[in-house]
Amino acid sequence: RRNKRGPVSLSDVQANAVSRYDLHDPELNRVLGGGLVPGSLILLGGEPGIGKSTLLLQTLLRLTDRKVLYISGEESEQQIKLRADRLAPSASGNNCLLLCETNLERIFEQLRDVSPDLLIIDSIQTMATETIDSAPGSLSQIRTCAAEFLKYAKSSATPVLLVGHITKDGA
């Protein structure tokens, strides 16, 4: 939602106290300023293999009070389940829904049906929309898909966590 009135003084803005999502991890909550803000989009970036997916899976297994949709464009349901069992053998995972999909339009069909409390996209480089004629991972695909996830986060007040891979040259 854009302000159609023009610029306003920061001191005139009324800020309501926002209830953040407690991630049940003191350090992660601290890094995020006290937890996840509803409607926010967080990019978790780093080189491939450093543990971004593992960190997010470990986090969502702690969130027994939230419905989490974990969308993977890189791993199968079985691979994710094996890693989850290794990380938290006693966790039920009942709050976690898995979707192995890379097509943006099909993902949004599922989002309308599921309405998660938290959305995890692993990774943004694997996502693609049919509206752009380029390969997944191209700059135009990444920008467009990330913009659509941001719109979803803002319109639904759902926090979205995006995994992004950074190559050795920083791309």
Segments and roles (model prediction):
Residues R2-S90, F108, R112:
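The Walker A/P-loop phosphate-binding site
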Residues K67, N94-N95, S115-L118, S155-L162:
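Loop/turn-to-beta-strand initiation segments
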Residues L28-V31, L44, I80, D122, ...:
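Conserved RecA-like P-loop NTPase ATPase core
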Residues E109-I121:
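Proline-aspartate-enriched helix->loop->beta-strand connector
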Residues P48-I50, E74-Q78, R86, T102-R106, ...:
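Conserved nucleotide-binding/hydrolysis micro-motifs of P-loop NTPases
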Residues R1-R2, L161:
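Non-catalytic accessory segments flanking P-loop/AAA+ NTPase cores
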Residues S140-H165:
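Substrate-engagement module of ASCE P-loop NTPases
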Residues A17-R20, G45, S92-E101, A128-R143:
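Flexible beta-alpha connector loops of hexameric P-loop NTPases
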